[in-house]
Amino acid sequence: MSPDEQLVLGVLGGMGPAATVDFLARLQAYTPADRDQDHIRVIADINPKAPDRNTPGSGAGSVLAEMAGALHGAGAEVLAMPCNTAHAHADLIQRASGLPLIDMIDLGAEAASQKGAMRVGVLGDKGALKLYREYLAARAMSLVSLPPEQQEAFMFTLYRIKAGDLGDDVTREMQRHAEELRKRGAEVLIAGCTEVPLVLENEDVKLELVDPGDLLARRCVAVCLRWEPLPHAPA
């Protein structure tokens, strides 16, 4: 395909920065290319100043909408956002930019469904859990979450990763959270925060681990190379 026929991808990033860099690396790795010009054009706003997506009234939605509008103005034709929780603002982002957004929550839920699971364990913050509960329920699946005290411990683990700690003890902590979900009846796991796969791989857990960020990178390549259709544009 001629580079002129490819779609330009706009990335709303920085939530967190390491997860965005990981996403961009996957995007590059999954693009078949013999030369630089074969790669997808990507316009990224890596904005770690976006307000906390879990804090009501933080203004995160308006900041994300502004970022999306700027990406459109810079030439983006389709959007991706490697942050699960920020998808709570997906409709606002699409309306503000006039661009379709490739939905990583939908990709994660659909992957779990295709594996035949009925009970899905999600390693995510409260915002991500809410989103996945809705998307899974739409597919007649139920979400398995950590008990309150361990959910707090998970958040502590998550912020260690955000602070740059990718050590073995952090991996062991994340394995412990994953094992608790298995014991509570989960049949498959979803990495519901993009930091989780930075320390946890499929071989680290006893259940299959769905990585929505990886699925998002693969779908972005497929859409931008026109192997798959664009998502529905906002009304």
Residue ranges and their predicted role:
Residues 1-235:
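Non-catalytic structural scaffold of enzyme domains
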